[in-house]
Amino acid sequence: MRKDIIFMGLVLALGGLCLATAVHGAQSGPGRVYLVLWFDTEDYVLPQTNDVAKRLATFLTQQGVRATFRVVGEKARMLERENRRDVIEALDRHEIGFHSNLHSQQPTIDMYEEPLNWEAGVEEYNRREGPGFEDVRRIFGQFPTNYCQPGATWAPQSYGALDQWGVKVYLCNGRDIGLDGKPFWYGRLLNIYNVPETGALRPNIDDSPESVNKPDTDWTNLEKVKANFREIYLRMSSQPEGGVVSFMFHPYEFITKVDWDIINFPHGANPPRSEWKLPPLRNPEVSARAFHFFENFITYTKSFPNVEYVTPSQVLMLFADVAQQHSFSSQEISRIAAGVEPEVSFQAYDDYALSASEVLALLNKFAVQTLRGRGSDPITLDGTPYGPDARSAALDHTVEIPWNQFSRTAQDVEGFLEANRRVPGVVWFGSQGVSPESYLVALAGVVKALQAKGAPPDPAVVGPAYLATAKYAVQDSRAWRWEISPDHVQRPDLIDIAKLQTWTLKPAKLRGGR
């Protein structure tokens, strides 16, 4: 896998150069609208869905559109077992992503991750999902550039494993994490997630088991979806930076009335393969209507000026995180310190954005370098520290810390960041433990004093603070409720971890608009 990751890095770097050249050579005009089309390619029960995926991929290739086919590990193995090289080759002309190893078989990802902390959850995700990732990579001969969880199985620990594998784009839809309906960075990955445009461009489909006894009125909202796209296009193209539109389909929904997994794994069921059922097929006229919807809509989107279909690896370049490997001057450090508030959050500027964990890393490095007589040296941001692995009790009053203790603690925090690449759950001033939020606010005050007066405050004041970005993470367990989960599912530990990882949250700035 290491060679694949290095190769993927070279591909992305070259892609970035091409995109940058195209952007800088463009004339000024309306903002460019980038379309990201993806298919969750997952049904490994009904063989006919293989031909649907091939038909969709072939049509797009003929249209000059490169989409993303995100494949489940078992689906890839199914194609290999059935010797469907024709399907594999058709999909391989597009970008490949990963969509879990077994999708809806129990336990689902959220279920096995719920009782685990961050580190154990990353390891378990590696153990269970890693074989599927490797099979998708091997069978398609292509590094899977992006990921989406199956249904409502989102788990924050997956980000740690995906980062280790070299996957840098989380392209999906859900309510678990979001930032005002726009792309963002979270867990070291670029997230095109929880954006409203995805739902607005979906066909009207009733895939409930009860729908088989009703008239099939699916795929009848083409004109409404076209109108939605036109509104989205006009809004985004009116902005100089343009925008990114993410929309998706499942190959199986073109020919089946009920989802393949809903009839096999409902409400926590996990029957053996010998008892799996084939989903009921649609009436041929309805399937024809579905393909007409798809083909007509794709050609409709291409009729607009300044519209370009892009893949996740290209999106990663369009949203390049220029804060990484940037050398921050003393003036920039001063601006960052001034931006720290007791409501700890990310910082967004015209040229870059910083997550709360990156702010902590930069300011702490500055304080330690100043202690060592190198306060004027530029500081390079090298990666994003993860959030803490556990919550600590928040201060409800201020405490005064002698400078000799604060300076020793700053060096201890620096060692922790270097060794663990995450924010400490508790910051210790001798026997006095405080939350990392309170430490960050006090640290910003120390940096401001060092820069303004050339001397640290003595004592340094540490007061109450809280992680304001936690509001952007899921707040209750309803986000994990879907037909595959057991009834009354509860995910309190995943909610806590999701909030802690908002230390890594920040806006993603589109740099390819024109």
Features from the language model and the residues they span:
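Metal-dependent polysaccharide deacetylase catalytic core of the NodB/CE4 family, i.e.
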Residues: 66-155, 178-181, 199-201, 244-251, ...
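Active-site beta->alpha N-cap acidic-glycine motif
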Residues: 28-92, 244-248, 252-254, 262, ...
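The substrate-binding groove and active-site-proximal loops of carbohydrate-active enzymes
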Residues: 38-48, 70-75, 114-125, 143-150, ...
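Bacterial N-terminal signal peptides that target proteins for export
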Residues: 1-9
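Boundary at the C-terminal end of the N-terminal hydrophobic targeting segment
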Residues: 20-26
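Bacterial N-terminal signal peptides
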Residues: 8-18
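Active-site-adjacent pocket scaffolds in enzyme catalytic domains
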Residues: 146-262
